[in-house]
Amino acid sequence: MSEAMMWLLVRGVWETLAMTFVSGFFGFVIGLPVGVLLYVTRPGQIMENARLYRSLSAVVNIFRSIPFIILLVWMIPFTRIIVGTSIGLQAAIVPLTVGAAPFIARMVENALLEIPAGLIEASRAMGATPLQIVRKILLPEALPGLVNAATITLITLVGYSAMGGAVGAGGLGQIGYQYGYIGYNATVMNTVLVLLVVLVYLIQLSGDRIVRAVTHK
C-alpha cells in the first residue's frame, strides 16, 4: 500500500469520526428533548397529552422507518439549501442528524420508562413541578441508559457514514467504495473494514466504561 493511500485512509478515519460525532451531537440536541416529551406526554405520565403523544410518536416512527440510503438521497435538495452542497463532509452531517434524531428520541423514551414509577410519584407528592421532575429525577436516574443510547447511536452512525461514502459523503465509506470496490483493490477494502471494526470496538468500549462510571452503586 502506497504512502499516499495510507494518508488517505488517515483522512478517511478523521472524516468518519467527524461525521459520526458531530451528527451524533446534533442528533441528541434534537432527539433528547423529543424523547423526554414522548415520555412525559404518554398516558398516565406527568404531562399526559394523548393527541400530542400520538402525533409526535407517528412522526418519529415515520422517520425511523425510512432506510438511511433512501433518506440520504431524498434529503439532497434540503441539504443543498442548508449547507450549499450535496456532497462532502458537511453535506453528510445533515441527513445523518435527521436519521439519528428519531432513533435517539425513541431510545431516550425507553430509557426513561425504566425508571421506577415510585420515584416520580414521590416527587409529585412533594410538590415538584414537571420541569423539576425531568431535571432532578428523570435525567439523572436515566443517565446510564442515556449513555448506552449514545453508544448505540454512535455505532449506528459509523455504519451510516460508511453508506454515505458511496454517494460522495467522504470518510472510510467513500475510500472503500471508490478505491476498494470500483478500483478492485482488495487490500484497501479489507483495510477499510478493519478500521471500521476498530472504530466500533473503541466506541463500544468507551461507552461501556462510562456506563459503569455513572451507574448508581
Curated annotation (Swiss-Prot):
Residues 1-19, 78-92, 173-185 are periplasmic. GO terms for biological process: D-methionine transmembrane transport. One of its GO terms (cellular component) is plasma membrane. Gene3D superfamilies: MetI-like. The chain crosses the membrane at residues 20-40, 55-77, 93-113, 152-172, 186-206. Pfam families: BPD_transp_1. PANTHER family: ABC TRANSPORTER PERMEASE, D-METHIONINE TRANSPORT SYSTEM PERMEASE PROTEIN METI. This is D-methionine transport system permease protein MetI. It comes from Salmonella typhimurium (strain LT2 / SGSC1412 / ATCC 700720).
